[in-house]
């Protein structure tokens, strides 16, 4: 079992989004993630939360964004109850992983995410 944590300053995300718009989001989010974020009442917090969650997942993997894992190798989506989950882009993305659990929280200044990976 491994854990990863990341925290993101909302101001940093807001400045980049205001400067580059959707092009900024397309660098690290899938189209489905972008649509979800833009529908949320707190757009910047939603973007920052997904950014932090992706960072937390690769930290838990122990690889960072390398070894074939890229920003768009997986998406951070929400189930019907609103809980975030990891959706791999393809079945081979996390071959040795059992369950990947994530939690995302944010306040006025930052978003934080935790990822827990259970290995097979």
Curated annotation (Swiss-Prot):
Top-level taxon in the UniProt lineage: Bacteria
Cofactor: Mg(2+)
Alphabetized UniProt keyword annotations: Cytoplasm, Fatty acid biosynthesis, Fatty acid metabolism, Lipid biosynthesis, Lipid metabolism, Magnesium, Metal-binding, Transferase
Any one biological process term the GO annotation gives: fatty acid biosynthetic process
Record field: catalytic activity: apo-[ACP] + CoA = holo-[ACP] + adenosine 3',5'-bisphosphate + H(+)
GO annotations of cellular component type: cytoplasm
Residues annotated for Mg(2+) binding in this entry: 6, 55
SUPFAM superfamilies reported in the protein's UniProt record: 4'-phosphopantetheinyl transferase
An MF annotation (GO) of this entry: magnesium ion binding
Repeat listed as a keyword: no
EC number in record: 2.7.8.7
Cell compartments where the protein resides: Cytoplasm
HAMAP family per the UniProt record, alphabetical: AcpS
UniProt function note: Transfers the 4'-phosphopantetheine moiety from coenzyme A to a Ser of acyl-carrier-protein.
Family of this protein: Belongs to the P-Pant transferase superfamily. AcpS family.
Protein name stated in the entry: Holo-[acyl-carrier-protein] synthase
């Amino acid at each position: 079992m491994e854990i990863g944590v990341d925290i993101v300053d909302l101001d940093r995300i807001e400045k980049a989004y205001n400067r580059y718009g959707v092009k900024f989001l397309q660098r690290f989010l899938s189209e489905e993630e972008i649509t979800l974020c833009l529908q949320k009442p707190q757009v910047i917090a939603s973007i920052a939360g997904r950014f932090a969650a992706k960072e937390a997942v690769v930290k838990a993997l122990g690889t960072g964004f390398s070894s074939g894992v890229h920003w768009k190798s997986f998406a951070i989506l929400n189930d019907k109850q609103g809980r975030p989950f990891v959706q791999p882009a393809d079945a081979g993305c996390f071959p040795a992983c059992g369950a990947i659990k994530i939690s995302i929280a944010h306040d006025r200044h930052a978003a934080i995410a935790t990822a827990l990976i259970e290995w097979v």
